[in-house]
Regions:
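Divalent-cation-assisted or electrostatically stabilized phosphate/pyrophosphate-binding catalytic cores
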Residues: 185-191, 248-264
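Membrane-embedded alpha-helical bundles of polytopic integral membrane proteins
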Residues: 2-221, 225
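Generic detector of well-ordered alpha-helical packing
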Residues: 29, 65, 163, 229-235, ...
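Final/C-terminal transmembrane alpha-helix of multipass membrane proteins
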Residues: 259-275
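Interfacial helix-loop-helix junctions of multi-pass membrane proteins
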Residues: 233-249
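Re-entrant/interfacial helical elements at transmembrane boundaries that shape
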Residues: 170-171, 238-241, 264, 268-269
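Juxtamembrane/transmembrane-helix interface segments of polytopic membrane transporters
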Residues: 201, 205, 270-274, 278
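Juxtamembrane boundary at the C-terminal end of a transmembrane helix
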Residues: 274-290
Length: 290
């Protein structure tokens, strides 16, 4: 084979990889990196700046959820969802985590009553969808001992699972995971997400040497599974209401909900686990266990 043949072969191979990744991959990558940089900056800046970012994101998520479920007739229900998310976030930021959690069921009941029977269950779920991860993330970051590292761990695992799942699915995906809900999800993508997250989780031992590398790896894999479940749940929600995306705010990704679905699920799971394992130190519960 001459040089020209090699060149043609290489170009064809490159074109094949590009086609599998999709024409929107560069835009998705750029948007993802930009969002990651913003999240990391606010996380490192301190507990209060991080809380501000989380609350702002929760307000947008509440808006997108309301528009998805109720359309242009969202009105007062969305106002309740947004107000509850803001109140819960503020209470958590000033250390009143118990009151923040109490605000969620109250807001959910109010949203249900105001929905007047129209998608009332989804009105209630919207309050928890935006509010619970908001409280959990702010609570996690406020942990004086390991809060910063715990939040970084969560974000890194979610990003790893999302990226590895996307790449493995696009490049090697053959077996559909749940085609009726998410046609592009594959078992190969799920396996790639779990393996990559387990590896990254185990490597986090170099950052937190007092933790168990095996436990961190297992935690990474479990959180990756939760993130993928969150992604599927949001896909099911969009399919239920006949929407492709929840918004157009982020190029290549859709709305904020489309980008943080995995983080919402993981943060909620971490918060609930912390209440059970070590309510006094959510970061310790995540990274070290009991």
């Amino acid at each position: 084979m001459n040089d020209h043949d090699n060149s043609v072969h290489d170009d064809g191979a490159q074109h094949g990889w590009t086609a599998r990744l999709g024409n929107d991959f560069p835009l998705r990558l750029a948007a993802g990196l930009a969002m990651g940089a913003v999240a990391l900056t606010f996380t490192l800046a301190g507990a209060m700046p991080f809380a501000v970012l989380v609350v702002l994101a929760a307000l947008v998520v509440s808006w997108e959820w309301g528009r998805l479920v109720h359309g242009k007739e969202a009105g007062i229900v969305v106002a309740v969802q947004i107000g509850t998310a803001a109140l819960a976030g503020i209470l958590a930021a000033v250390g009143l985590v118990g009151l923040a959690l109490l605000a969620l069921p109250i807001g959910a009941i109010l949203a249900t009553l105001l929905s007047l029977g129209r998608n009332s269950i989804f009105s209630a779920l919207g309050v928890f969808y935006a509010g619970l991860p908001t409280v959990a993330l702010i609570w996690l970051r406020s942990d004086a001992w390991l809060g910063l590292l715990a939040v970084v761990f969560v974000i890194v695992i979610v990003v790893t699972a999302d990226t590895a799942g996307f790449l493995a699915g696009r490049l090697f995906g053959r077996s559909k995971l749940w085609p009726s809900v998410s046609p592009n999800k594959t078992w190969e993508g799920l396996i790639g997400a779990l393996l990559a997250s387990a590896i990254v989780g185990g490597l986090f031992w170099f950052v937190v040497p007092e933790a168990s590398a095996v436990r961190l790896a297992a935690t990474g894999a479990v959180l990756a599974l939760v993130a993928q479940a969150g992604d599927l749940a949001e896909s099911a929600l969009k399919r239920r209401f006949g929407a492709k995306d929840t918004g157009t705010l982020i190029p290549g990704h859709g709305g904020i909900m489309d980008r943080v679905d995995g983080l919402v699920a993981v943060a909620s799971a971490v918060g609930i686990a912390a209440i059970v394992i070590d309510v006094h130190s959510p970061a310790r519960a995540l990274l070290l266990g009991s």
